Amino acid sequence: MLFDVYGANAPFQWMGLIMVLAALIICNEFARRSKFGGCFMFFGVCAAMTVYCIAVEVGAAMGAEWALNNPTHTDMNSWFHYAKVYAATAGCIGFMMLKYSWGKIGRSHWFKAFPFVIVAINILIAVVSDFESAIRAWDSSWVSSEGVVLNGGIFNVFNGVAGLLNIFCMTGWFGIYISKKRQDMLWPDMTWVFIIAYDLWNFCYTYNCLPTHSWYCGIALLLAPTIAGLLWNKGGWIQNRAFTLSMWCMFCQMVPMFVNDSVFAVQSVNNPAVNTVVSVIALVANILALGYIIYRAKKLGVNPYKQEVFVGTKDFAKAMARRADTAYLLETEPKSATPAEIAEMVAYNELPVNGEVGFAYVVKNADEIDVEVDTIKRE
């Protein structure tokens, strides 16, 4: 077995997994369906968490007993947790900028690559953490600043390499679209090929480096966006992932007792042999995924990063079918949008459902834009 889920607490541990999974799915729906929900979660709750964490750390620095013994200070003080929560939340805000066309940046062509950049940063944070364990404790173990015993070894290297490969499994960086009612930022080229490779890599990362949290962040936290992405939110997996990751990280930063010290707490078996098997699976999955992407790119004759490689596939078409009507986008586009920005939005939105092989939008000057686009927007 991968986890110690036996004994008197087993019913609570399984119930906790189901509770976390359900809560993440529900909170994701709340955050994605309206501007209020998204702003409440990623501005309001994040601000409250920041104030709380600063208060705890300032209190600890001043020697206050309540702060020195606070679980946020004792159990969540590593660089990784703070880097992860703010990187994930930055991703959520950036995705909202894209789907709501907020500001010049949110409507810029270059900003369509933001999802790739922020996901790559999040992956690199975990890769560094994996390599940290390998360097600190090769074929042995070390105790983190949070008091967690971590093994180190070749499995960290295997999974670190898997994470680096996973970054190159993200294709069609500029193929970002807006869903009906502007509820989702869609990335149709991010299909099951990437999702499976990512989930296996990320599960392995949590198993290697977060053994006290992996039951929840390695299972429930990965299942929540994947279930939504497979069943009702095609093309929106990466937004689901960012939203649920940010919310989970904020919860753990403020209530770490749930996963560390309660009846719901679960430890992995923390066995290097098991770590190695899981890491090899993650590495092989990412090698296969990247190989398949290279194959499709060569078959279509496209650059897999500047252009989409899964055009014509079932998953790609289902995601593209969820795009908002052009008329709705024109009606809801901010009045500050320029004709050039509107023209780009329309060009993306009127691509066929199956996509267009080799499509790469060329940014135009305002003088080249048909004024009819601007007229339609204001009707």
Regions found by a protein language model. Name each.
Residues 2-5, 66-79, 139-156, 266-278:
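Membrane-interface segments at the starts/ends of alpha-helical transmembrane spans
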Residues 2-102:
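An N-terminal, globular interaction/scaffold subdomain
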Residues 15-24, 83-99, 159-174, 221-226, ...:
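Hydrophobic cores of alpha-helical transmembrane segments in multi-pass inner/ER membrane proteins
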Residues 21-25, 217-342, 346-348, 358, ...:
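C-terminal transmembrane-bundle signature of multipass membrane proteins
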Residues 29-40, 100-110, 230-243:
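Membrane-helix interface "capping/anchor" motifs
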Residues 44-65, 93-100, 116-133, 192-208, ...:
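Hydrophobic alpha-helical transmembrane segments and adjacent interfacial helices
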Residues 61-66, 105-108, 131-141, 210, ...:
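A cytosolic-side transmembrane-helix exit/cap motif
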Residues 105-235:
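Generic multipass alpha-helical transmembrane bundles of integral membrane proteins
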